[in-house]
Regions:
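Active-site helix of classical SDR
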Residues: 131, 167, 175
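The beta1-alpha1 cofactor-binding region of Rossmann-like NAD(H)/NADP(H)-dependent oxidoreductases
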Residues: 49-50, 70-81, 113, 226-227
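Alpha-helical segment proximal to the catalytic Tyr-Lys
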Residues: 136, 180-184, 241
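Substrate-binding pocket helix/loop in short-chain dehydrogenase/reductase
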Residues: 107-108, 112-120, 213
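Residue(s) in the substrate-gating loop at a strand-loop-helix junction
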Residues: 151
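Conserved glycine-rich Rossmann-like NAD(P)H-binding loop of the short-chain dehydrogenase/reductase
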Residues: 38-54
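C-terminal substrate-recognition "lid" of short-chain dehydrogenase/reductases
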Residues: 128-131, 187, 221-250, 255
Length: 256
């Protein structure tokens, strides 16, 4: 009984302010829901204002505190504006979840410049821009949690995903470096590396390919968005106060 109470308190985010990018759907929405349910005030960021509005409305319908901020994560000026607006509204920033990301899959010899650039810009540059903007208010508050979305593809590589794998490998390197830079200010920086998760992105692979994928996963199934959200909650919470520079795989044993 006591152990359960301690665990609940450790992941209680009441009074904490969080930014989640790519929050309008998929993993980002699941993460926003999890943080809200744990007591955080969540600033939902996404390039799609329409989908963002639907997500924020759904969060508020549960009695949670959420605001929507339309933003292209590759636009440095807009990123800075969003962070400033969040800090002004809620008095600080405690948690940043860099989840926004895209794929433009094709074999490397067929990959066009714009396919490479778009993935690197959103997945890696967007992560950097939000870290840079969020670091200042976190340093001022002498506390922070930064969680970046990596991927097992950034650890092992994946045919047809040279751009995506490179961007996620870059996120891992960025995570470890910034973890060292900000540790002295009590700011932890970690990454979550999902494997195959049941989202719109994986559904597009088709049933036949997904059945083959499941055979490669020791647990024999795809992960759920909630599995990733739980990992993010842990890293955002006091339960992970001594964890930094770490990459937490959520892949059902795929990379074991």
């Amino acid at each position: 009984m006591t152990e359960g109470l301690v665990n609940t308190l450790a992941t209680n985010l009441s009074g904490r302010v969080a930014i989640v990018t790519g929050a309008a759907r998929g993993l980002g929405r699941a993460i926003a829901e999890k943080l809200c349910a744990s007591g955080a005030q969540v600033a939902c960021v996404d390039v799609s204002a329409e989908l963002l509005g639907e997500t924020v409305a759904a969060l508020r319908a549960n009695g949670w505190t959420a605001e929507g901020y339309p933003c292209d994560v590759t636009n440095s000026q807009r990123v800075n504006e969003v962070v400033d607006e969040v800090v002004k509204k809620w008095g600080g920033l405690d948690i940043l979840v860099n989840n926004a990301g895209i794929t433009r899959d094709t074999m490397v010899m067929r990959m066009k410049d714009d396919q490479w650039d778009a993935v690197l810009d959103i997945n890696l540059k967007g992560t950097f821009l939000f870290i840079r903007a969020a670091a200042r208010p976190m340093m001022k508050g002498r506390r922070g949690r930064i969680i970046n979305m990596a991927s097992v593809s950034g650890m092992t590589g994946n045919p047809g995903q040279a751009n995506y794998s490179a961007s996620k490998a870059g996120v891992i390197g960025l995570t470890r470096t910034v973890a060292r830079e900000l540790a002295g200010r009590n700011i932890t920086v970690n990454a979550v590396a999902p494997g195959f998760i049941a989202t719109e992105m994986t559904a597009a692979l088709g049933e036949q390919i997904l059945e083959e994928v499941k055979k490669r996963i020791p647990l024999g199934r795809l992960g759920e968005p909630g599995d990733v959200a739980n990992a993010v909650l842990f890293l955002a919470s006091d339960a992970a106060s001594f964890v930094t520079g770490h990459v937490l795989t959520v892949d059902g044993g795929l990379t074991a």
